[in-house]
């Protein structure tokens, strides 16, 4: 009954939920039982390293060294240096040699501050020292003073001068563009120096062939012009497959991008080049005529039916396939700038007759008009009234300037009252009597023709116009 009661009590005793309770480690037991002295006999040697195996390794390592063999490493690689075949020496890595130290010489306060870059070289005395002879007395040496200096006259009066110059030429380098005079020539008694000269030499006559080129040779724009004329490329703006759209907005000329998309302040495009646009699935352009436009090509100026037309060719993207290809028609956008009016015929009337103009600088044939002018009486009285006349004088200041003839300018001269008392005697009278404030002699009375001169001032009667 007693054993049954004990077995029943053991069965009723509660068991830990995890099964058998684990024993603490040797390190944990050593920390708690060392001070109390209740440690099991296998805990202290294991923690303190005094087991039999530890003693064998401790005393055996004093006589045998197995450090590089990797015994007990468990890696199987042979340690740090690896396995070495038997009978061979392991490879050794040469150690870098240390650099020799630099000797630093201290500099004192009295030493110079300038350090010489050249090392001081020691003087080596070679040879046997000069022998010394004993002296047994001396002799009296008498000297005399000479006033004439001991100078030798090297130059001679009648000897010739010989000058020789030797030049060395490097055959590997010759610069033909530089003309150098030849070296002086060796002479006897005088110096002869040659000057630079250029000699002519014969050249080879090479026959030249002329290329057979058709067309006008005076207006060739290229070195080898292509015969024939190339037709200008057609723009293809008025084809049957191109839609014609007239644009009224003048912004189409300056900023066509504003008609396709709304203004983007960050966009800085060039309106003269091809413009590319990208739209979302649903969009509304500012101008309905530019719906689905993805490209506007560069502008072109044409003339059609008497007008100047500004044109751009556009590309629509109405449909988009699954592969991303866009399909659309070509559109010709144009804006008429202005009509070309026919040339108007305006009746023009001359302001002055051409027959009354006289050029004072015109060349006159003296042989033909000399006889007629010489027989003309020049001793004639003036009426005293200045008649209006025209004179064309070229005003040139370095370059010829085309002037338009204007209206005549008349100047009334004062009329002398009679009787007139001359201040100088009239007799003997001159062969030629000239009246007027200024005058020009007839070319027939000039002995030598002078070169035509340019005058920068315009001279009129009595007045000078700057």
Swiss-Prot record:
Subcellular location per the Swiss-Prot or TrEMBL entry: Virion; Host nucleus; Host early endosome; Host Golgi apparatus
Motif (Nuclear localization signal): 7-24, 447-455
UniProt-annotated stretches for the region Disordered: 1-25
GO biological process, alphabetically ordered: microtubule-dependent intracellular transport of viral material towards nucleus; symbiont entry into host cell; viral penetration into host nucleus
A GO molecular-function annotation: DNA binding
Coiled-coil region: none
Superkingdom of the source species: Viruses
PTM section of the record: Highly phosphorylated.
Disulphide connectivity of cysteines: 33-39
Basic residues composition-biased segments: 1-13
Classification via InterPro entries: Late_L2
Gene Ontology cellular component terms for the protein in this record: host cell; host cell endosome; host cell Golgi apparatus; host cell nucleus; viral capsid
Cited Pfam families: Late_protein_L2
Keyword line: Capsid protein, Cytoplasmic inwards viral transport, Disulfide bond, DNA-binding, Host endosome, Host Golgi apparatus, Host nucleus, Host-virus interaction, Late protein, Microtubular inwards viral transport, Phosphoprotein, Viral penetration into host nucleus, Virion, Virus entry into host cell
Recorded family membership: Belongs to the papillomaviridae L2 protein family.
SUBUNIT field: Interacts with major capsid protein L1. Interacts with E2; this interaction inhibits E2 transcriptional activity but not the DNA replication function E2. Interacts with host GADD45GIP1. Interacts with host HSPA8; this interaction is required for L2 nuclear translocation. Interacts with host importins KPNB2 and KPNB3. Forms a complex with importin alpha2-beta1 heterodimers via interaction with the importin alpha2 adapter. Interacts with host DYNLT1; this interaction is essential for virus intracellular transport during entry.
Described purpose of this protein according to its UniProt entry: Minor protein of the capsid that localizes along the inner surface of the virion, within the central cavities beneath the L1 pentamers. Plays a role in capsid stabilization through interaction with the major capsid protein L1. Once the virion enters the host cell, L2 escorts the genomic DNA into the nucleus by promoting escape from the endosomal compartments and traffic through the host Golgi network.
Record-given protein name: Minor capsid protein L2
Highest classification ranks of the organism: Viruses, Monodnaviria, Shotokuvirae, Cossaviricota, Papovaviricetes
């Amino acid at each position: 009954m007693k054993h049954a009661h004990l077995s029943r009590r053991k069965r009723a005793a509660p068991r830990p939920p995890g099964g058998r309770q684990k024993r603490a480690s040797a390190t944990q037991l050593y920390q708690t039982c060392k001070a109390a002295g209740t440690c099991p006999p296998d805990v202290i040697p294991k923690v303190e390293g005094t087991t039999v195996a530890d003693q064998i390794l401790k005393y055996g390592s004093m006589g045998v060294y197995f450090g590089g063999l990797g015994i007990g490493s468990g890696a199987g690689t042979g340690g740090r240096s690896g396995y070495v075949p038997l009978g061979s020496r392991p490879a050794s890595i040469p150690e870098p040699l240390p650099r020799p130290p630099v000797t630093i010489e201290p500099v004192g306060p009295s030493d110079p501050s300038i350090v010489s870059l050249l090392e001081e070289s020691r003087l080596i005395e070679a040879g046997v020292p000069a022998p010394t002879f004993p002296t047994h007395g001396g002799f009296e040496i008498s000297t005399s003073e000479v006033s004439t200096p001991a100078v030798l006259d090297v130059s001679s009066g009648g000897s010739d001068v010989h000058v020789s110059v030797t030049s060395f030429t490097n055959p590997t380098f010759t610069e033909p563009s530089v003309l150098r005079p030849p070296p002086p020539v060796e002479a006897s008694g005088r110096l002869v120096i040659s000057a630079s000269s250029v000699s002519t030499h014969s050249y080879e006559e090479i026959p030249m062939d002329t290329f057979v080129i058709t067309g006008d040779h005076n207006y060739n724009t290229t070195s080898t012009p292509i015969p024939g004329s190339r037709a200008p490329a057609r723009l293809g703006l008025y084809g049957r497959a191109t839609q014609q759209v007239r644009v009224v907005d003048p912004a189409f000329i300056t900023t066509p991008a504003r008609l396709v998309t709304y203004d983007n302040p960050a966009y800085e495009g060039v309106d003269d080049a091809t413009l590319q646009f990208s739209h979302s699935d649903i969009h509304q352009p500012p101008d309905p005529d530019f719906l689905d436009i993805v490209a506007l090509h560069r502008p072109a100026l044409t003339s059609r039916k008497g007008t100047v037309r500004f044109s751009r060719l556009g590309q629509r993207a109405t449909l988009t396939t699954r592969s991303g290809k866009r399909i659309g028609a070509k559109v010709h956008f144009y804006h008429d700038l202005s009509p070309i009016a026919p040339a108007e015929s305006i009746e023009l009337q001359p302001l002055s007759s051409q027959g009354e103009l006289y050029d004072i600088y015109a060349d006159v044939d003296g042989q033909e008009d000399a006889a007629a002018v010489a027989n003309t009486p020049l001793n004639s009285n003036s009426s005293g009234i200045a008649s209006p006349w025209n004179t064309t004088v070229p005003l040139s200041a370095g370059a010829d300037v085309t002037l338009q003839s204007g209206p005549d300018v008349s100047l009334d001269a004062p009329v002398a009252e009679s009787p007139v008392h001359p201040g100088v005697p009239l007799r003997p009278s001159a062969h030629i009597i000239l009246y007027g404030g200024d005058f020009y002699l007839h070319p027939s009375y000039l002995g030598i023709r002078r070169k035509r001169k340019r005058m920068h001032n315009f001279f009129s009667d009595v007045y000078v116009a700057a």
